[in-house]
């Protein structure tokens, strides 16, 4: 994990509203189907893909929005877009294989949640967090916005 400063950039794609409890049950989970839709629409895997978490109702426990897509313009009509704010983020990283993307993502999020439960951990701003998937390098990075830096 490292502290990084990111400049603002725009991500375009498909958006859903969900909540953590719904994502724990296969019959109500929406994030996996969202990614399936995006990759079906794109047909060719992009070099970089983004999963953006925003509009937190009450931290990560209530409703929040997830946008899955690409930096810049999405190649299909009626796409949603948002600007990831520039600022200070904690960056958590892991390697993955094509067959282990979901498992790697869940394990890395578990690492994030455990880190922020520690005494003295920086305060999350709950404005915008995002996942960055590198198809070529098979890397996953999760960026968590933090306050006071």
What are these regions (language model features)?
Residues 1-149:
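A solvent-exposed interaction/effector surface
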């Amino acid at each position: 994990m490292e502290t990084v400063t990111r400049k603002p950039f725009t991500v375009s794609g498909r958006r859903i509203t969900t909540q953590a409890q719904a994502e724990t049950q296969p019959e109500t989970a929406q994030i996996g189907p969202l990614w399936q839709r995006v990759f079906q629409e794109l047909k060719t895997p992009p070099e970089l893909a983004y999963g953006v978490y925003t509009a937190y109702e009450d931290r990560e426990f209530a409703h929040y929005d997830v946008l899955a897509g690409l930096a810049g313009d999405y190649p299909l009509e009626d796409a949603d877009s948002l600007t990831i704010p520039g600022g200070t983020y904690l960056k958590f990283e892991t390697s993955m294989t094509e067959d282990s993307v979901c498992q790697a993502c869940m394990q890395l999020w578990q690492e994030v949640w455990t880190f922020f439960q520690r005494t003295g951990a920086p305060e999350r701003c709950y404005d915008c967090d995002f996942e960055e998937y590198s198809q070529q390098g098979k890397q996953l990075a999760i960026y968590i916005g933090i306050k006071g830096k």
